[in-house]
Curated annotation (Swiss-Prot):
The chain crosses the membrane at residues 22-42. SMART domains: TIR. Interacts with host MYD88. Interacts with host TLR4. One of its GO terms (molecular function) is NAD+ nucleosidase activity. It comes from Escherichia coli O6:H1 (strain CFT073 / ATCC 700928 / UPEC). This is NAD(+) hydrolase TcpC.
């Protein structure tokens, strides 16, 4: 009987000590974790304050807070923006012209806008967009939306020079193609390149009524960094495309950069070689192997590196 009572006492003692030990360990954990988390929060606050001060010092006076600690800041005086993180010194900087679209999305419940999101599209493959979240704060979203619109619409002199001076427009690509290929490939490619913010000389969106076709094509050829040549059976049978190709080849002879970027559209190497050994020797993207989006992405990366 005594032995049984001793066992019961021992079990109770273990339970009491076990519970106390758990409480002690939990208290020790909290006493370490809470100060550590407070320290990290304070350190993050100081870093955020430091980066904000630096942005203001650099002239980026309009700052939008994004998802997490991300930000989008604008320097109106030189028409540039920065996108980065308030807890890191890394950022992407470019001309405002690199932002090629923006929109406001929200869900509406009982006539109230909730989950407000601004999406800003940037012409950079590694940094394609920035999202600004406002949740249920409709008033703040409306104020910032007005600010965002003002950035792109106010007629200050420098932004006009960067974004609206058509006489000084420099193109990433001149697209040489046969009109018969517009619907099947060219127009979808141009739409995708436009979405990525690439600046293109393309007859449908560059020429206006009354323009001289020959003079404008010559201007586009001179002002483009690259010529995209969409080789197809239709292309090979055209005289006008031959004129454009000759102009591009003449430029390529005197330029160290790869001026001509061929795309083979429903055509093979043997057929290209019969038309031009020069083009047949060049690395080409083929529509039989890649989708329009994949081809546009490859071309956009080339354009961004050259800028």
């Amino acid at each position: 009987m005594i032995a049984y009572e001793n066992i019961e006492f021992f079990i109770c003692l273990v339970n009491v000590l076990g519970n106390n030990m758990y409480n002690i360990l939990f208290f020790i954990f909290l006493s370490i974790a809470i100060p550590f988390l407070l320290f990290l929060a304070w350190k993050q606050h100081l870093k955020t304050k430091e980066i904000r001060s630096y942005l203001l010092k650099e002239g980026y006076n309009i700052i939008f807070n994004g998802e997490g600690n991300s930000y989008l800041a604008f320097n109106i005086s030189n028409a540039t923006f920065r996108a980065g993180n308030l807890t890191s010194n890394d950022y992407f900087q470019a001309s405002i012209s690199y932002i090629h679209d923006y929109r406001w999305e929200w869900k509406e419940v009982e006539a109230k806008k909730i989950n407000n999101i601004f999406i800003i599209y940037i012409s950079n493959i590694d940094f394609p967009s920035q999202k600004l979240f406002y949740r249920n704060n409709k008033s703040l979203a409306e104020i910032d939306w007005a600010k965002l619109q003002a950035i792109f619409h106010q007629p200050y002199e420098i932004q006009n020079d960067v974004m609206q001076d058509n006489n000084n427009t420099h193109y990433d690509f001149f697209i040489s193609h046969a009109k018969e290929d517009k619907d099947t490939f060219v127009r979808p490619l141009v739409d995708e390149l436009n979405r990525l913010g690439v600046i293109i000389w393309y007859d449908e969106q560059t020429l206006e009524v009354g323009d001289s076709l020959r003079r404008n094509i010559d201007l586009g050829l001179r002002k483009a960094n690259y010529g995209i040549v969409i080789l197809s059976h239709n292309f090979l049978n055209k005289k006008w495309t031959q004129y454009e190709l000759d102009s591009l080849i003449n430029r390529a002879v005197y330029d160290d950069n790869k001026i001509i970027l061929p795309i083979w559209h429903n055509i093979n190497a043997q057929e290209v070689s019969k038309y031009s050994h020069y083009l047949a020797d060049k690395m080409a993207l083929q529509t039989s192997l890649y989708s329009v989006k994949e081809i546009a992405r490859e071309l956009a990366e080339i354009a961004y590196r050259r800028r």
